[in-house]
Amino acid sequence: MTMLNTLENLVELQKETVKKALKRRDDAKAKIDESKKSIFEFAKAVHDVKEGDMDTLFTVLDFRIDDYANAVKWLAIEERTLERYTERLLQEKTNG
């Protein structure tokens, strides 16, 4: 084997090493891009779930507000009924 053959072999080995390194670099870039996409999708999913939870929370809150509003309405009705009942009792007492 001549020195030239040895150098040619070394150059070929270096080319292969560079090709492998470039492939690993490209694979790493692809993995990074894939990871970024995965993180984004996960963050979006978490956001959606959180948003869904918030929607559920607001739905429950709306029901609670409706329940409260109905309770206030019925309290007002009962208070008016009691006022009328009391007025009627007072009228009957003064008339009778």
For the regions a language model picked out, list residue spans one by one.
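Alpha-helical interaction segments
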Residues: 15, 32, 58, 74-75
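Amphipathic alpha-helical coiled-coil segments
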Residues: 21-25, 60-92
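Extended alpha-helical coiled-coil "stalk/arm" regions
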Residues: 28-57
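Short, charge/polar-rich alpha-helical segments
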Residues: 2-33, 69
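Short intrinsically disordered terminal tails
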Residues: 1-5, 9, 89-96
